[in-house]
């Protein structure tokens, strides 16, 4: 029996750190990093123009929902800094969600609005929400980089946010009346991926790759 899978495409800064955290989330089956969102064909690391560094995630929707992936995405990168993550500057490091269908677009818009309304971040959420275009797979040396080089560069970590559930519940009720859905991934402790990989809070460790 063939397993039903879905795909998500996200950009949130250097793809090394993004992949290292997202690949360990329960229900994620496969990830690969690459370049998307721009207009340079056959993009490479040395020539990707205005593409973003991005990650393609294949997941089992019976285990994890697209909404939950987005919630975790908003927890592991700063969506309020235009074209920047940590030490990394430029459009390659922008925050973006590339949806593959209208349902994903609606979920992305709802999730981004809920994060913005919660004031969990000091600034306004600037995450771009755009239709997915061509995804150019990155070179082999960029795939699973931190799995191969555990002490390599990363600016991504799981934020331990203060009482996000309570704050977001208020915003959900305010925005949607009885349509409240728990903001399940943003919890103050016991993040689900920790059970699989012992995820820790890492700061920027090395100069830009």
Swiss-Prot record:
Listed GO biological process terms: protein modification process
Region of interest (Disordered), ranges: 183-209
EC number: 1.8.4.11
Protein name listed in UniProt: Peptide methionine sulfoxide reductase MsrA
UniProt keyword terms in alphabetical order: Oxidoreductase
Signal peptide: none
Enzyme kind, highest EC tier: oxidoreductase
PANTHER family in UniProt: PEPTIDE METHIONINE SULFOXIDE REDUCTASE (PTHR43774), PEPTIDE METHIONINE SULFOXIDE REDUCTASE MSRA 2 (PTHR43774:SF1)
Compositional bias (Polar residues): 199-209
Active site: 14
Family to which the UniProt record says this protein belongs: Belongs to the MsrA Met sulfoxide reductase family.
């Amino acid at each position: 029996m063939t397993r039903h899978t879905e795909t998500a495409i996200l950009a949130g800064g250097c793809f090394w750190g993004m992949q290292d955290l997202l690949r360990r989330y329960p229900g994620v089956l496969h990830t690969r990093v690459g370049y998307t969102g721009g207009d340079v064909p056959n993009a490479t690391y040395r020539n990707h123009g205005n593409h973003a560094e991005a990650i393609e995630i294949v997941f089992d929707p019976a285990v994890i929902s697209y909404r939950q992936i987005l919630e975790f995405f908003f927890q592991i990168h700063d969506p309020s800094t235009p074209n920047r993550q940590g030490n990394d500057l430029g459009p390659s490091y922008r925050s973006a969600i590339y949806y593959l269908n209208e349902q994903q677009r609606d979920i992305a818009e709802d999730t981004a609005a809920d994060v913005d309304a919660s004031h969990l971040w000091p600034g306004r959420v600037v995450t771009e929400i755009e239709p997915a275009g061509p995804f150019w797979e990155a070179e082999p040396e960029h795939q699973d980089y931190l799995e191969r080089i555990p002490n390599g560069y990363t600016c991504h970590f799981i934020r331990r946010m203060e009482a996000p559930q309570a704050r977001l519940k208020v915003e959900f009720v305010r925005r949607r009346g009885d349509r409240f859905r728990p903001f399940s991934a943003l919890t103050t402790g016991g993040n689900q991926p920790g059970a699989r990989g012992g995820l820790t809070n890492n700061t920027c460790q090395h100069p830009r790759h």
